[in-house]
């Protein structure tokens, strides 16, 4: 293999796969990228055996072929050069020569035929989804995935098809046992995708899918053989689904009381900023904030005996009974940051019930935060 490629093009391609590469794997090949030179095209592939990604970039091909190279080393070389083009050539006995008109690198590599092959399931049914919808659904659920290794059943986003009033929707749900985030979106042709009773997408796979969605253009999306497959242009990502049963989350969501005295109307930004200030004196031992809700006010009190306390009151629209509860401010921050509404609604049935969060500009979204003892 022998190529010349624009530095910016190579940097874009190599940067794109860094999140997939395994840094401490017992399989060294998983820390490499596969470079495949075709006629005027360079394919860059990466995998950790759970996620596979491939995209193509324009290149001046001198000789076609394939090589592997450390993804980190190639990224560092590309970042540090001040040359507009980089020359890469395969040498004998698994060596690679790289030149940028200033420095010359001779690097060892692994045989290209040892790189795990990225295979797209055959005869897969795919539908087109707007990228902005994919991004919104991921951003409004991914933060609720558990960070605990023991919580395997919760370590991804659950995706299923639902029917509301005769129309088909795609639903994503995530929970860590202390909070839940859910979003429904109407997707044309979603009925063509076979999800059985729903599927679990791992957090790392969602992050990579989100990167693909944030680029221009719509996404082709499909499921087959325990894999999620997505395409955009020449980019392909294959994500292995989690083999886990998601908990019965529907029983956790209380029925919202629609009477106005139980609904708290509040500006999202002041609440978000106040919750951030509550975090200033937070510690692992003192994580909660006391929330007092009265007629037209919401008061937050955070106390840490080792540091001090912080107290703040903000205006709201509320005409119900006094409510005193405790919450983890981090959970409010994550939910509020993901939302777009200027005005949001908090629905609390009683002092032992979860807090439901919705907003008019966040169509189909529901946030749920469990109370805690403070």
Language-model segments: residues:
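Structural preference for solvent-exposed beta-strand-turn elements
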Residues: 1-374
